[in-house]
Amino acid sequence: AYALTRAENAGVAARVLTPSCGQEPFENELSVLLREQEIDLILLAGFTVILSAEFTKQWPRRILNVHPSLIPAFCGKGMYGLRVHEAALARGVKVTGATVHFVNEIPDGGEILLQKAVEIAPDDTPETLQRRVMEQAEWQVLPLAAERVCAEIVREKEQKND
């Protein structure tokens, strides 16, 4: 993934964990790593693993996901990647977009932070729509939402230190 190249170029440590060893061992290893590194915010982009309630409850309001639709449309278990855009086109909707939400135990069911709409063109394919939603919505709302939540985290830490 290009994120690993970016991390290396920026001198940021990176680790790759895969859920191939099973959900529980994956989540346990991830939790240990996040705590060791004192991570305050987890961003999910293109992450297709559904995290367990046990994991998400350890990180309340600290996991953000970007989903390629305007939730509650075209979301939930099994709705990711091109499937979302195929469903939007099959349904004939005129507008789709992206949603950033907090992650909880319900797939795509957490509190919505930001949404951005993208019009669907008559000649769109799932691939062209996916690209436009990424460029016009996902890549814009995820950094904005992360910035807002980071500011909230900083305020909380400052209040604890006062």
Predicted regions and their residues:
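One-carbon transfer enzymes
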Residues: A1-D162
